[in-house]
Every structure is written in structure tokens, then in C-alpha cells.
Swiss-Prot record:
One GO term (biological process): gluconeogenesis
Subcellular location: Cytoplasm
Class in the EC hierarchy, top level: isomerase
Protein's name according to its UniProt entry: Triosephosphate isomerase
Gene (name only): tpiA
Binding site for substrate: 9-11, 145, 180, 201-202
Catalytic site positions: 92, 140
Keywords: Cytoplasm, Gluconeogenesis, Glycolysis, Isomerase
Task performed by this protein: Involved in the gluconeogenesis. Catalyzes stereospecifically the conversion of dihydroxyacetone phosphate (DHAP) to D-glyceraldehyde-3-phosphate (G3P).
Gene Ontology molecular-function annotations: triose-phosphate isomerase activity
Assigned EC number: 5.3.1.1
Cross-referenced PANTHER family: TRIOSEPHOSPHATE ISOMERASE (PTHR21139:SF42)
Native source species: Methanocorpusculum labreanum (strain ATCC 43576 / DSM 4855 / Z)
UniProt entry tagged with the keyword Acetylation: no
Any one GO CC term of the record: cytosol
């Protein structure tokens, strides 16, 4: 994907389901077309295939499992690819994995030609994740997730230091930041600190006017 990337995670919010989810996806498509900034979405699993078919935007899964076959209820990487997704989140703070599982999921993503967005919670874990050569490492201090307090303002060092740590391991791995991202100023600050984009959720999904929020997010890029 072109940089910067704004990736919107719908989580399991009611506001990110059904018709409301479609309205968010439509707004993301419109703002991406008008601004030229890449806006990806990670909708709920039942929406993956229809959204991939209907909208001209990058669609990511919220999780994949490094399995296939007789594993009821799991989400194999090949299924996500078959649905039309470009990638998947891995190890989100609300769906944590072991180091071995993270590595296996990154490899499953690569095998199925999917981008991998490995979520981390600090500089050390970001460096460890970079060793698996995912597409992105997305650092999110857990205490700021959903807080309305932007990591770009509250803890800019974690962005700057994560970028440095990741690039020391692999210059090919891109870095996103998340937690409390809610405005164009937050996005610009993150990019100025070296990030390749942002990962966010509630500020868009729970907004009364998601399109207006998305327009603000890209306004300073």
C-alpha cells in the first residue's frame, strides 16, 4: 500500500455492523478517492467478502489463524485471501497471541499473499515483531486505546523509538501507530515522527459523522 495508511478497525462495535458498516466503508472510499490518501478498513468478519466486492478500498481482516482443515470457528489465512482481503491484523491487544503464534500467522499471511499488520504494545515487542518481517508493525500503548488521548501527543517517544527499533531490524517493515488517534493533527504528528500511517477505531466507527472525521484525518497530509 502507498504511505501513509489510515487503517480503520471496526472491532465488534454495534456501530460497525450492518448498514452502519456500509456507510463507514462508503465514506472511506469517497475520502480516499478525493484525497489520494490510502484508507483501509478492517470490518467484522461477516462483512469481508461483500465489502471486498463492493468497495474500491483495501480491506483487512481483524485476525487470522495459522491453520486450515478441521478447525471449526477458526479464520484461515487462505479464507481471508479468497474473500478478497489485502491483509490482516495480527496480535491486536484485544486478540493477543504468543510469539510463536505471531510468527506462524505472519508466515501464513506471506504464503497467501496477504499483508500482515502485527500489533504491539511497546518498543521491545515492536522490535521482536519486526524480526518476522511483517508488512507493518502497529504500536499501540494499551492504556491509551479507546481513551480519546492520542498516542501522538501523550507518548510521542514510543512512536519515534519504535520506528528506530523496527528500522534497525528491517528497513522494509513499515510502522503504524495507534491508540487515541482522532484528528488530522494526530495523523500529521505521527507521520512527522516517522510513522507510515495510523491504526484507529472508535473515533471513526462511533462518530456521528464518520465521513467528516475521515476528512479531518487526511486534511494535513
Amino acid at each position: 500500500m502507498s504511505s501513509p495508511l489510515i487503517l480503520v478497525n471496526f472491532k465488534s462495535y454495534r456501530e460497525g455492523a450492518g448498514n452502519a458498516a456500509g456507510q463507514i466503508a462508503s465514506a472511506a472510499e469517497l475520502v480516499m478517492q478525493e484525497s489520494g490518501v490510502t484508507i483501509g478498513i478492517a470490518p467484522q468478519f461477516v462483512e469481508l467478502h461483500p465489502f471486498c466486492k463492493h468497495y474500491e478500498i483495501p480491506v483487512y481482516a481483524q485476525h487470522i489463524d495459522a491453520v486450515e482443515g478441521a478447525f471449526t470457528g477458526r479464520i484461515p489465512a487462505f479464507t481471508v485471501r479468497a474473500a478478497g482481503c489485502v491483509g490482516s491484523l495480527i496480535n491486536h491487544s484485544e486478540r493477543r497471541l504468543t510469539i510463536a503464534e505471531i510468527e506462524a500467522c505472519v508466515e501464513a499471511a506471506k504464503f497467501n499473499h496477504l499483508e500482515s499488520v502485527v500489533c504491539t504494545n511497546n518498543v521491545g515487542v515492536s522490535a521482536a515483531a519486526a524480526a518476522f518481517s511483517p508488512t507493518y508493525v502497529a504500536v499501540e500503548p494499551p492504556e491509551l486505546i479507546g481513551s480519546g488521548i492520542s498516542v501522538a501527543k501523550a507518548d510521542p517517544d514510543i512512536i519515534r523509538n519504535s520506528v528506530a527499533a523496527v528500522k534497525k531490524i528491517s528497513s522494509d517493515v513499515k510502522v503504524l501507530c495507534g491508540a487515541g488517534i482522532q484528528s488530522g493533527e494526530c495523523v500529521k504528528t505521527a507521520v512527522d515522527l516517522g510513522a507510515d500511517g495510523v491504526l484507529l477505531a472508535s473515533s471513526v466507527v462511533k462518530a456521528k459523522d464518520p465521513e467528516a472525521v475521515l476528512r479531518d484525518l487526511v486534511s494535513l497530509l
